Amino acid sequence: MSRRVEYTLAPPQRNESDGFDYPDGIPISYNLHRLRHFECEGSYPKYPYGSLVKFYAMVGLHRYNVLEGKNLQLDTLKSFNMRINCGASSYYITLAARVPDSGLKQIFQVLVHEERLGSLDMTCTIARPRVTTNVPFLRPHSESEYDYMDNDELPDWPSEIAFDDTKRFHLVKESELRDNDWIRLYLELTLVAHDRFLTVHYLSQLEIVKVAIEEVEQPNASLNTKTTFVYITYKDLAKAQIGEPVDRKAIVRKIINETTGLLRLRGDYWSGERSVITPEEEYMLLHGGEKVRNNEQRSKKLKRRVGVHRLWRWWYQAYKNRGLRSSSY
C-alpha cells in the first residue's frame, strides 16, 4: 500500500537558511506558527531556558561527531530561533564549535524538535556547518524511518543479575566515563527537560555512580538504524539537603539513523525506590518472549508506579502524553 507523504514548506521570502539566523524573527505563516529570535552574545544576553538550549546545541554536535567521526565541542551559543506555540517547540540554534587543543572554530547550525513537554523526548534533524541555501526546506511528516523512531516505549530497569550478562550490557569504566562526556550530557538533559529552571549549581551536584549500555536490534528498524539504551545510576546530592532520596536512576534511549541522520532521544528518571524487574520476569523476557500480564498483575504494577511517582504526577504525565505534542515543525 502506498504511503502518503506531506510536507511543510517554509515561507518563500524566508527560505534561504531553513529558519536560522533571522534577527527580526519570522512572521506568522499560514499555519499560525512563527519563530522568535534570541541573541545569546553580548554583555547582558537575555533568552529563555539557557541550560536547555545549551544542551540541545551539544546534542547536535554529538550527533555530528557520531556520524562524521569528529570531536567538536561547544564553544559559545550565538543565537537561536524558537518556534512559538502552546506546546512542544522547535529550536533553530546557531553556535560556535571548537576543535579541542586548537584554536580552530567553526559556526554550526542545529535544529531540534521537541516531541512533548515535561520529559526528554526530542529529535535532532540538522547538525551541520553553517550554510545558506535557496532551496525551500521540506520536512516529511510521515516516512518509514521516522515512524519507527516515534516509538515512545522505555524499558523497565533490569535486575542487578541481568547486568552481569556481558553479552547484553557494557558496564562503563571510570576512565571511559571521562572520555565519553555525552553520558553526562544525556543525564543532565533528562533532568532539565523535566524542569527547565534547574541551575548549573544544581546539576554540578549530580554524581554518576554506574553506567550500563545496551545495544539492541529492533524488529521494525532498518539496517541503518541503531538503538541504544543507557542505564545510569547516580546520586543527587542536592536532594540530600532537603531529605529526599539521594540514589536515583535514569534511562535514556538513543535512536540514530545513519542514512537520514535523524537522532531521537527519549529519557526518564526517578528515585531508587521504583520497582525493578524481578529475576523471574527477566527470565520470561529472555526465554519466553513477550510477557502477558493478567488484570491483577497490571493493577499491582500501576499501584507501585503511582506510589512512587504520586498520583498527581501520573495524571499530569497522562495529560502531557495526550495533549501537549508538537503538531508541526
From Swiss-Prot:
Pfam families: protein_MS5
Domain of life: Eukaryota
Keywords: Developmental protein
Signal peptide: none
Family named by the database record: Belongs to the UPF0725 (EMB2204) family.
Known role: May be involved in embryogenesis.
Record's protein name: UPF0725 protein EMB2204
Upper lineage: Eukaryota, Viridiplantae, Streptophyta, Embryophyta, Tracheophyta
Gene: EMB2204
